[in-house]
């Protein structure tokens, strides 16, 4: 069944345009509430959000929709996406709801859901919700309407959970760390986590005004972090995105490390302690150098579709624990049920502290292949798959690269973009092939 509203990470779009409107949010919550009440007499849902100004409007609409279906609501306020996932499980709630468009700019927003176990929900559940949306509302009678309360210590509970994933015998004392929260959901949480574990913390991107989320800061704009690390002679820099489910890191020299590299560090740290790591899941975008390095160490590697939900599904199928994406969505299922930027950063810092090595030293044997990613904006209704010029360009690039590189062309699941990725042993070759395909896509 083709889904009408749900994409790869919930429902997302521009505020004020369908489906990100208050009336749709109310109808959506009512439909979700009806689905929940098919199996539960009195469901409870948690609602968290990032710092976009539109979050207030959507939060109120969702609250009303759930209450009208006989569902109780607990408001968490601004909280990272993984914090909502954790509290949904810890509070024994029926469902977790996040109002966020992650790394997108403030005019966008979105709505996504977590199961009672704190995991992303399957496509089948989303299809059930979409079917319920097509039915007329059935309002609960007055005696059965839901109620709403606020969990005032939600942030503090999540901070303690994050700290609990860091080894008790280690400390961050003596380290200077720059933390960039992208003016997003972790603005009041991330600096405290690292400070309470002993680090000297300098915070940037921690002054949200409702309009500046992800603006020239955070994991998708790491230049600000690189400058701050160098200017303050810090040991590390940590950049989160707007909802803090992804992370990028910087070392004292200002070198940026992406999710592929951080995932390898997490795996290598476990191998160094003789922990069994049977396999790791990446995506179609994961750098070939990481795959080869893991295989040299006897660790199986599998590629899932792009999107942390698909990495999670493959991990569950294989009964493995570790996976992630180059974008910084990293999963360690014995630490958390979903990708968590803060916990991932703590796992990497733990590896550095325990080994006494820097990130560059831990990754000395894993030089990444040059990888070029170009985004081509698609016109409404444009079908890139039927573009013969692009098809020829893809075939030519694959023939030129052979076994020494990769080509991936795919539509974004969250934006009207065509993503063109080329990986090769030489940067010039990767750039040339990627540009040819991007030009062909624009010509179509």
Swiss-Prot record:
Top-level division of the source organism's lineage: Bacteria
Keyword annotations: Isomerase, Magnesium, Metal-binding, Phosphoprotein
EC identifiers of the protein: 5.4.2.10
Phosphoserine: modified positions: 102
InterPro entries assigned: A-D-PHexomutase_a/b/a-I, A-D-PHexomutase_a/b/a-I/II/III, A-D-PHexomutase_a/b/a-II, A-D-PHexomutase_a/b/a-III, A-D-PHexomutase_C, A-D-PHexomutase_C_sf, A-D-PHexomutase_CS, Alpha-D-phosphohexomutase_SF
Binding annotation for Mg(2+): 102, 241, 243, 245
Signal peptide, first to last residue: none
GO cellular component: cytosol
A GO MF label: magnesium ion binding
Biological processes annotated in GO: carbohydrate metabolic process; peptidoglycan biosynthetic process; UDP-N-acetylglucosamine biosynthetic process
Cofactor: Mg(2+)
Pfam families noted in UniProt: PGM_PMM_I, PGM_PMM_II, PGM_PMM_III, PGM_PMM_IV
Reaction(s) this enzyme catalyzes, per UniProt: alpha-D-glucosamine 1-phosphate = D-glucosamine 6-phosphate
Family stated for the protein in its record: Belongs to the phosphohexose mutase family.
Function: Catalyzes the conversion of glucosamine-6-phosphate to glucosamine-1-phosphate.
Protein name stated in the entry: Phosphoglucosamine mutase
Gene behind the chain: glmM
């Amino acid at each position: 069944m083709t889904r009408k509203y749900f994409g790869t990470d919930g429902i997302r779009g521009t505020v004020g345009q369908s489906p990100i409107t208050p009336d749709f949010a109310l109808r959506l919550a009512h439909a979700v509430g009806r689905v929940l009440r098919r199996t539960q007499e009195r469901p409870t849902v948690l609602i968290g959000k990032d710092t976009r100004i539109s979050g207030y409007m959507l939060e109120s609409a969702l609250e009303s929709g759930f209450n009208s279906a006989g569902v109780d609501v607990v408001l968490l306020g601004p909280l990272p996406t993984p914090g909502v996932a954790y509290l949904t499980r810890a509070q024994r709630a029926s469902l977790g709801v996040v109002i966020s468009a992650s790394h997108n700019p403030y005019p966008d927003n979105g709505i996504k859901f977590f199961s009672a176990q704190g995991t992303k929900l399957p496509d089948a559940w989303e299809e059930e919700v979409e079917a319920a949306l097509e039915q007329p509302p059935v309002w609960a009678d007055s005696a059965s309407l839901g109620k709403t309360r606020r969990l005032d210590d939600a942030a503090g509970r999540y901070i303690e959970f994050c700290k609990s994933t860091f080894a008790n015998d280690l400390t961050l004392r003596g380290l200077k760390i720059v933390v960039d929260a992208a003016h997003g959901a972790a603005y009041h949480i991330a600096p405290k986590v690292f400070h309470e574990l002993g680090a000297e913390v300098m915070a940037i991107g921690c002054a949200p005004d409702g309009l500046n989320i992800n603006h020239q800061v955070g994991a998708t704009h790491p230049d600000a972090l690189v400058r701050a690390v160098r200017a303050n002679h810090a040991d590390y820099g940590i950049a989160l995105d707007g909802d803090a489910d992804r992370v990028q890191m910087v070392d004292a020299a200002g070198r940026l490390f992406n999710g592929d590299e951080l995932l390898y560090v997490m795996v290598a740290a476990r191998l160094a302690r003789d922990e069994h790591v049977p396999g790791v899941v990446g995506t179609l975008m994961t750098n070939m150098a990481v795959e080869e390095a893991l295989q040299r160490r006897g660790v199986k590697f599998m590629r899932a579709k792009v999107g942390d939900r698909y990495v999670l599904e493959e991990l569950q199928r294989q009964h493995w624990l570790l996976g992630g994406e180059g974008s910084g969505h990293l999963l360690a299922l014995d630490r958390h049920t979903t990708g968590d930027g803060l916990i991932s950063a703590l796992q990497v810092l733990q590896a550095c502290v325990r080994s006494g090595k820097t990130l560059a030293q831990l990754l000395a044997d894993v030089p990444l292949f040059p990888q070029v990613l170009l985004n081509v904006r698609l016109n409404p209704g444009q079908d890139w798959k039927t573009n013969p010029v692009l098809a020829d360009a893809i075939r030519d690039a694959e023939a030129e690269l052979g076994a020494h590189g990769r080509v991936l062309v795919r539509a974004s699941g969250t934006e009207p973009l065509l993503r063109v990725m080329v990986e090769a042993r030489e940067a010039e070759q990767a750039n040339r092939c990627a540009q040819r395909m991007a030009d062909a896509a624009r010509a179509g």
